[in-house]
């Protein structure tokens, strides 16, 4: 009943957020915070990949950080719809590929049905309905949709990993790693538990998928590995407004404070010392939380079930880096039932409630940034950029979630020691 109550509140908040965003779009002609400030860029995570899926120098000139599988998945969208890719830029390609995005939208709507079917034993009908609609209209879900990001496929394979064993689990890891490389962390439970057979199978499937998809796509597919390292080390890859749109990790604050535009500002001349100190502390906190969680899993691996290990690793992934993106919070949706079975279930569910709620409707700051073409309304409009409360609240709450699941692992060990003493 506690879980059902939280799900109802989360659904109500998600509906409020959806209505607010739609009303704002109809009245002002663009989406407010937390959606990206560049209103021309709608759906461009998908169409940037689409454009470069049909270019031969994606890994060399563009520096693509997407494994080959992502480009092949996008090509499948074009193949299914029969759309012939055309255009000399990704935005022109978007304008000529409406049926492709309609298919993406259908996949966005169907994916939660797929993983809910896999987890059907975990929910009653009313809870399943609530979880489904939260999964498609909550703020992180709408953010993923507005970006057109392929992460919307990931919850299906996380659920498959959760409810299946052995070969199916190895297959799930292989697909996830080849969609989003940070899922390589899912190898950790296999290593910690000494399940070398399944570890070898998972690595084999992952490498086979990487090599086969890369061979089909591009002879330089291996270049994605150095591209990923350079991507993560860049200090000015994104603008401050992009990073603060829907951050999920404390590392976003460190990135902002170390951004060249901040370092060269009048603010930095006045408060640079304090900014450096705060950025360093935040960076250490972010890294320390991740290391503590992984260390706890290693030390107390014998007392953690597969479900708890998966939860900890997914929470680590969302806290790992600002580059993971705020849409990574949708990875929590297929884990709701697991969170509900843990020691601190009530706290977890409340944290998830706030993480998916439209707290960004509360403005912290705003500035007029001029006129832009808004893709969603098809005209040029004046943009009043707003920094929403979610930019401050979500990374902090997500970090607290990371600390709490780490404590959960420690408590598993402590409980086991109590039983031994008895």
Question: Positions of the model-derived regions?
Answer:
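Hydrophobic/aromatic-rich transmembrane helices and adjacent perimembrane loops
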Residues: 325-342
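Transmembrane helix boundary and interhelical junction motifs in multipass membrane proteins
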Residues: 153, 181-184, 326-330
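Membrane-embedded alpha-helical segments of transport systems
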Residues: 178-181, 208-209, 358
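Primarily membrane-embedded glycan-assembly and transfer machineries that use lipid-linked glycans
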Residues: 1-163, 167-168, 197-325, 377-391, ...
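Aromatic-enriched
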Residues: 62-67, 337-422
